[in-house]
């Protein structure tokens, strides 16, 4: 198998002219990605002694002088890069900035093992708290009544003479905004695809879809162009007031009704009250059993007070997780709509929203409901082979692929009343929802201290009540949950939590059956554990065996109590089990399935570093992506970002911000062709190195200024009010001096 083989992808025609020509070199002539100071003894002679190769391929591979090459000591935790690509990078503090590897806990928030008051460690370590991204806005604010209207036919402004925004279109275009961007050939990417632009006059490419028309009376009018013949009929909602092809948009009036408690959630309230009563009854039964003085008659009286739940759960839509369905993990900040859309393009068969909190969902807060938006590509069924669909497997026989989709929502909640209400709200207002996932693993301090996320790991009874209640009100939408091994190291809790989520406690199960959890994902780490330690796939394998034992004994369990009810069982009477942690290649993926016996693998950081990991899984081989191909993915993200957030000043600022968040992971990718041995490990950090061309070197930079330069290849110069602070301080360099 050729490790350098790659699957061809379409490249933007303007890529070479707009991106590669914008590659910026540093003042000393070295690639901007590396602030290289050559060894004092070698000076310029060290550079002269470098050997240039691969001239025939148009690439410049630089080999350091013999004195610069260090012995191959195979350092644990360090990526094994070929000697000819290594360089020496010395910063003012006399150490390599890469000596401190990136702290992936920064992506999830400070954990309890770190102090919440004074910062324990200062300088370049740790994460930047309360990051400021500045503000990208026009100097003159154009009224929305003018934004999408031609000059002589504006919409009515509800504020009238009291409006403090500009209604003078020509003044706005001349003085109130930056000049049009020159990237993408000066043509609006949204207009080129859809035939109209929902940013209207605020678009930073507006010159490409406007014209001045002379009317019969001699007046000249500025008009917006529309060419709806360019666009295909969307599967999702499309309007000139919102993103094209985006589904799960909730009307403002509905969110306002939620905020005023005007939405009917009586089913949730009724079920929560019943569950509180039944939980109290279970406690009394338990106390009666342990009290030897209680007579059997009293136990019988307590059992007689049992009341059936007010309603039964609806039968759920069938799910399928298997070898062909790698799943993108729910990712805070990075798991935005454009990135998920990119991963679906590259082969992700399942996606999740960023984690939303139950209480703001119930209150109708815009920030949480915005996380529920999905692209129409996420509403398509997972791609399965004809052999799988024709299988005689009992799971596949009851699975309807045409009714399935890829996008699921993830929520966190600290109590069953909140979780039940949130589940009812989501299933009421979101028509495109594969499943609702309960987060029982988030390590963020704020979530943990509120009793949600990983705090639930120590409260297995609460996990069962939440899943049982959500399952009761979610209609046909299945309920799943995501766990960690536990809270503290050497104190695993996952097996107990899986037992409660799948089987239920004996008291509940005897009367109500199983809770109805359709799938469980286990992240192979504890809350306390750092990302520098590998995920525990051995423990995941033990939990997979527990799930299999449930499958084997399911009929035995249900037959001893009552005839199983389809509404109390997981879809297809199966509980799928997903593993999560350190999956970085097709080799990791298939090893997890074959050796740990999970149904499929959920991929998080691996997809952030190289989104084409899904392509590798489908191809069954490593793909050595060139710098041009990788830049094509960045361009695609920018296009998707502008479609989602707009091509105006604010939308491009938002796209730039989330692109930089993506690049804060993507720079860590070490091309396969530069490695001495395979497989690559996700926690291996590379020493300073040069790429096979200048663009590849730039993409490997851990300096956030270089990430901004990459963003400017497609989004133009950053607005003067734009700011960016990386999550991890080691990427910031001189940020303290900048204030």
UniProtKB/Swiss-Prot annotation:
Biological process, per Gene Ontology: mRNA processing
Active-site residue numbers: 442 (proton donor)
Enzyme class: oxidoreductase
Localization annotation: Cytoplasm; Nucleus
Superkingdom to which the source organism belongs: Eukaryota
Cofactor dependency: FMN
Entries under Pfam families matching the protein: Dus
Molecular functions per Gene Ontology: flavin adenine dinucleotide binding; mRNA dihydrouridine synthase activity; RNA binding; tRNA-dihydrouridine47 synthase activity; zinc ion binding
Zinc finger (C3H1-type) residue numbers: 137-170, 187-212
Reaction equation(s) it catalyzes: 5,6-dihydrouridine(47) in tRNA + NAD(+) = uridine(47) in tRNA + NADH + H(+); 5,6-dihydrouridine(47) in tRNA + NADP(+) = uridine(47) in tRNA + NADPH + H(+); a 5,6-dihydrouridine in mRNA + NAD(+) = a uridine in mRNA + NADH + H(+); a 5,6-dihydrouridine in mRNA + NADP(+) = a uridine in mRNA + NADPH + H(+)
InterPro entries hit by this protein: Aldolase_TIM, DUS-like_FMN-bd, tRNA_hU_synthase_CS, Znf_CCCH
Disordered: region residues: 1-77, 92-133
Family matches, as PROSITE patterns: UPF0034, ZF_C3H1
Keyword Nucleotide-binding found: no
EC number: 1.3.1.89, 1.3.1.-
Basic and acidic residues bias: start-end ranges: 32-51
Gene Ontology cellular component terms for the protein in this record: cytoplasm; nuclear periphery
Binding residues for FMN: 330-332, 410, 482, 523, 580-582, 604-605
Keywords associated with the record: Cytoplasm, Flavoprotein, FMN, Metal-binding, mRNA processing, NAD, NADP, Nucleus, Oxidoreductase, Repeat, tRNA processing, Zinc, Zinc-finger
Broad class of where this protein is predominantly found: cytoplasm
Family under the similarity heading: Belongs to the Dus family. Dus3 subfamily.
Chain's role: Catalyzes the synthesis of dihydrouridine, a modified base found in the D-loop of most tRNAs. Specifically modifies U47 in cytoplasmic tRNAs. Catalyzes the synthesis of dihydrouridine in some mRNAs, thereby affecting their translation.
Protein name: tRNA-dihydrouridine(47) synthase [NAD(P)(+)]
Name of the gene encoding the protein in the UniProt record: DUS3
């Amino acid at each position: 198998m050729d490790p350098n083989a790659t699957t061809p992808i379409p490249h933007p025609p303007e890529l070479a002219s707009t991106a590669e020509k914008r590659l910026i070199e540093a003042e000393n002539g070295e690639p901007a990605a590396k602030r290289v100071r050559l060894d004092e003894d070698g000076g310029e002679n060290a550079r002269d002694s470098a050997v240039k190769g691969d001239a025939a391929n148009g690439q410049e591979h630089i080999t350091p002088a013999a004195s610069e090459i260090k012995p191959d000591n195979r350092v644990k935790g360090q990526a094994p890069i070929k000697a000819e690509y290594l360089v020496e990078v010395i910063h003012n503090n006399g150490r390599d900035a890469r000596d401190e590897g990136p702290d992936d806990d920064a992506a999830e928030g400070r954990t309890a093992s770190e102090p919440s008051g004074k910062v324990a460690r200062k300088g370049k370590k740790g994460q930047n708290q309360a990051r400021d991204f500045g503000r990208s806005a026009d100097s003159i604010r154009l009224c929305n009544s003018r934004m999408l209207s031609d000059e002589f036919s504006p919409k009515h402004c509800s504020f009238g003479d009291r409006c403090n925004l500009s209604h003078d279109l020509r003044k706005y275009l001349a003085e109130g905004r930056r000049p049009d961007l020159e990237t993408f050939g000066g043509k609006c990417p949204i207009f080129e695809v859809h035939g109209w632009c929902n940013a209207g006059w605020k678009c930073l490419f507006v010159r490409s879809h406007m014209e001045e028309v002379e009317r019969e009376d001699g007046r000249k009018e500025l008009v917006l162009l529309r060419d709806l013949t360019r666009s295909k009929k969307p599967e999702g909602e499309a309007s000139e007031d919102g993103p094209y092809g985006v589904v799960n948009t909730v009307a403002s009036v509905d969110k306002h009704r939620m905020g005023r408690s005007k939405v009917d959630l009586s089913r949730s309230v009724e079920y929560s009250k019943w569950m509180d009563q039944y939980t109290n009854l279970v406690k009394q039964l338990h106390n009666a059993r342990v009290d030897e003085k209680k007579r059997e008659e009293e136990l019988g009286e307590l059992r007689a007070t049992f009341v059936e739940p007010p309603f039964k759960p609806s039968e759920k839509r069938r799910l399928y997780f298997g070898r062909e369905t790698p799943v993108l993990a729910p990712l805070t900040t990075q798991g935005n709509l454009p990135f998920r859309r990119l991963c679906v393009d590259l082969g992700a068969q399942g996606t999740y929203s960023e984690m939303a909190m139950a209480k703001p969902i119930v209150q109708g807060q815009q920030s949480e409901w915005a996380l529920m938006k999905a692209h129409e590509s996420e509403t398509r069924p997972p791609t399965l082979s004809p052999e799988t669909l024709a299988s005689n497997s009992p799971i596949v026989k009851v699975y309807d692929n045409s009714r399935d989709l890829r996008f699921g929502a993830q929520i966190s909640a600290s109590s069953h009343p909140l979780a039940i209400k949130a589940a009812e709200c989501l299933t009421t207002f979101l028509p495109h929802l594969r499943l609702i996932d309960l987060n029982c693993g988030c390590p963020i301090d704020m979530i943990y201290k509120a009793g949600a996320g990983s705090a639930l790991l120590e409260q297995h009874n609460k996990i069962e009540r939440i899943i049982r209640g959500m399952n009761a009100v979610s209609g046909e939408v299945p309920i799943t949950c995501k766990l960690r091994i536990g809270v503290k190291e050497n104190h695993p809790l996952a097996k107990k939590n899986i037992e409660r989520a799948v089987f239920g406690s004996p008291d509940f199960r005897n009367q109500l059956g199983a809770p109805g959890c359709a799938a469980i994902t286990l992240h192979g780490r504890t809350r306390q554990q750092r990302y520098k330690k590998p995920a525990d796939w051995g423990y995941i394998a033990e939990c997979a065996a527990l799930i299999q034992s449930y499958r084997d004994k399911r009929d035995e369990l249900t037959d001893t109590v009552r005839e199983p009810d389809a509404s109390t069982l997981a879809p297809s009477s199966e509980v799928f089990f997903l593993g999560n942690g350190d999956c970085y290649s097709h080799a990791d993926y298939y090893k997890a399935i074959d050796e740990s016996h999970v149904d499929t693998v959920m991929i998080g950081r691996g997809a952030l570093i190289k989104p084409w990991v899904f392509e590798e899984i489908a191809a069954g081989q490593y793909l050595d992506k060139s710098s041009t191909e990788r830049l094509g993915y960045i361009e695609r993200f920018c296009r998707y970002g502008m479609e989602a957030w707009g091509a105006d000043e604010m939308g491009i600022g938002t796209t730039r911000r989330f692109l930089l968040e993506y690049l804060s992971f993507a720079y860590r990718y070490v091309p396969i062709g530069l490695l001495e041995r395979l497989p690559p490990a996700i926690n291996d950090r590379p020493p300073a190195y040069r790429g096979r061309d200048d663009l590849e070197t730039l993409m490997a930079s851990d300096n956030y200024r270089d990430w901004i330069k990459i963003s400017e290849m497609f989004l133009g110069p950053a607005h003067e009010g734009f700011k960016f602070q990386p999550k991890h301080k080691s990427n910031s360099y001189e940020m303290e001096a900048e204030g």
